[in-house]
C-alpha cells in the first residue's frame, strides 16, 4: 500500500509505504540501478511520444483541429530524449489552446489547483504500482529532481495526463471544489486499453509492469495508452 501526503498546493510532499512490496525487491532495485542509458532513453521517448500524441488527439476531440495538427507535427519530429524540447512546445500550445493564451501552469487559480490535484491522484496510482514492482520511486528515467520522491512514477504516468486535462477542461467554469469531485470519476470510469474497456487502476497496473519489463529487457514491447 502507498499513502501520499500533499501540501497546501495539493502537491505530494511525503509518503508511507511498506519496506518490502515484493519478495525480491532487492534484486529489482539492483536491476533498476543498472538500467542502461540507451534503454532508458528509448522507453522514455516512447512514453513522451504517447503523451504528445494524446494531447493532439484531445485537441482534435475538442475541434481545435489546427492546433491539434501543430502538436502532431511536433510528435512526428520527436527525437530520442527530446533535445529540442518538443514536449515543452507541445504543452504550451496545448494548455494555451484549452485555457487561453494568458494561461500558465505557474498561475494561482482553480484550473491549476484542479490540474495539480488530478495529477497527484494519477501519481499516487503509478507510485503504488512502481513500489509493487519492487522499484524505487525516486530513481527516474529523465525526471531527476532531487526534491521529487516520485521521479519514476512521474515519468511513467505522462501519457495519462490528458485524462485529467479532459475533466478539468469540461468543468473549467466551475470552482475547485466542484472540479475536485469530478476528478474522482477516474476511479470508476473505464477506458480503452489493449482492445478492451478497463478500469484505470487495472490499466495503470498493466502499463507500469510492462514498462518495468521493457527497462529490465525482459520484454521489448513498450505498452501504449491512447485516450
PLM features per residue range, with description:
Residues 1-6:
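Short hydrophobic alpha-helical runs that function as membrane-insertion/retention elements
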Amino acid at each position: 500500500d502507498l499513502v501520499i501526503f500533499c501540501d497546501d498546493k495539493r502537491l505530494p510532499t511525503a509518503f508511507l509505504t511498506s519496506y518490502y512490496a515484493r519478495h525480491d525487491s532487492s534484486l529489482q532495485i539492483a536491476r533498476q540501478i543498472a538500467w542502461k542509458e540507451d534503454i532508458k532513453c528509448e522507453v522514455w521517448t516512447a512514453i513522451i511520444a504517447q503523451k504528445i500524441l494524446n494531447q493532439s488527439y484531445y485537441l482534435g476531440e475538442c475541434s481545435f483541429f489546427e492546433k491539434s495538427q501543430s502538436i502532431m507535427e511536433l510528435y512526428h519530429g520527436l527525437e530520442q530524449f527530446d533535445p529540442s524540447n518538443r514536449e515543452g512546445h507541445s504543452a504550451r500550445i496545448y494548455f494555451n489552446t484549452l485555457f487561453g493564451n494568458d494561461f500558465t501552469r505557474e498561475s494561482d487559480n482553480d484550473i491549476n489547483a484542479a490540474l495539480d490535484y488530478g495529477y497527484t491522484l494519477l501519481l499516487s496510482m503509478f507510485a503504488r504500482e512502481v513500489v509493487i514492482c519492487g522499484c524505487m520511486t525516486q530513481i527516474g528515467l529523465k525526471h531527476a529532481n532531487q526534491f521529487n520522491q516520485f521521479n519514476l512514477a512521474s515519468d511513467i504516468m505522462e501519457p495519462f495526463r490528458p485524462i485529467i486535462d479532459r475533466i478539468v477542461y469540461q468543468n473549467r467554469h466551475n470552482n475547485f471544489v466542484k472540479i475536485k469531485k469530478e476528478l474522482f470519476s477516474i476511479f470508476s470510469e473505464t477506458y480503452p486499453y489493449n482492445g478492451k474497456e478497463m478500469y484505470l487502476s487495472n490499466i495503470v497496473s498493466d502499463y507500469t509492469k510492462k514498462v518495468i519489463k521493457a527497462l529490465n529487457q525482459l520484454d521489448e514491447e513498450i505498452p501504449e495508452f491512447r485516450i
